[in-house]
């Protein structure tokens, strides 16, 4: 049974990878997208939340947690769905993306929906200085391949999945401390290499626990909550 499950997951992962490549190369025109009353304009070259399930799954989890009054950082914001969901739910939101088109799209979409989101061009946490946040949300790339351009950065995490090493290495410096300990929410497909990702988290003092699972086409989207590991 476990072998069949593993084979099925590998097949789903391969299909999702092919679908991602199709989406990157064949969606050549900007288009709009609606999610629970939010309207987003998604330009060419920016991750489209309507073509994948992950963003909607994580946005729903953000809303479910009711982050009223929390400071939220959206890492790799794309067209801004997670940022807009958090802002509408009452959070103070900062969004970052290395893709300048994504930065512009998130800023424009926030304004068009009457929401306030601070948007910063940044490779992960690089341009945030010593700022800390109560909640970090991320829909990361997770396929093992070096991205060829900004569009592929939304999908490919480096040949050795180095994205996750960089993310966890810097995460602790940007989570709130004191009475309001910061945490992160990350959405991943069940087909990704959780061994590598969890090992990177552990190396940098974090633990990952499943908070929700949502069955979608070609498998499951899993939302993980990430906290600082407690001493044994």
Where are these predicted regions, by residue range?
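A generic structural signal for short
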Residues: 47, 71, 95, 185-186
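S-adenosylmethionine
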Residues: 98-100, 118-229
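Short, well-ordered coil/turn elements that cap or connect secondary structure elements
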Residues: 35, 67, 112-114, 179, ...
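N-terminal auxiliary segments of SAM/dcSAM-dependent transferases
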Residues: 1-32
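SAM-dependent Rossmann-like transferase core, predominantly class I methyltransferases
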Residues: 20-85, 105, 218-231
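Conserved SAM/SAH cofactor-binding pocket of Class I
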Residues: 55, 59-138, 144-146
């Amino acid at each position: 049974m476990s072998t069949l499950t593993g084979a099925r997951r590998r097949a789903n992962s391969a299909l999702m990878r092919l679908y991602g490549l199709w989406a990157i190369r064949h969606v050549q025109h900007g288009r709009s997208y609606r999610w629970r009353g939010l309207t987003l304009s998604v330009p060419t070259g920016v991750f489209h939340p309507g073509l994948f399930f992950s963003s909607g799954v994580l946005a729903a989890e953000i809303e479910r947690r009711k982050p009223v009054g929390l400071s939220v950082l959206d890492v790799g914001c794309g067209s801004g769905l997670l940022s807009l969901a958090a802002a509408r739910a009452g959070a103070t939101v900062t969004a970052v993306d290395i893709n300048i088109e994504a930065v512009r799209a998130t800023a424009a979409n926030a304004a068009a929906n009457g929401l306030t989101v601070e948007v910063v061009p940044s490779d992960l946490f690089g341009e945030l200085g010593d700022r800390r946040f109560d909640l970090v949300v991320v829909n990361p790339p997770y396929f093992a391949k070096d991205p060829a351009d900004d569009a592929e950065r939304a999908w490919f995490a480096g040949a050795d999945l180095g994205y996750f090493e960089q993310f966890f290495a810097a995460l602790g410096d940007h989570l709130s401390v004191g009475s309001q300990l910061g945490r992160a929410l990350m959405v991943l497909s069940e087909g990704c290499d959780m061994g590598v990702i969890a090992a990177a988290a552990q190396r940098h003092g974090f633990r990952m626990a499943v908070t929700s699972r949502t069955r979608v086409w070609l498998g499951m989207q899993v939302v993980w909550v990430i906290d600082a590991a407690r001493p044994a």
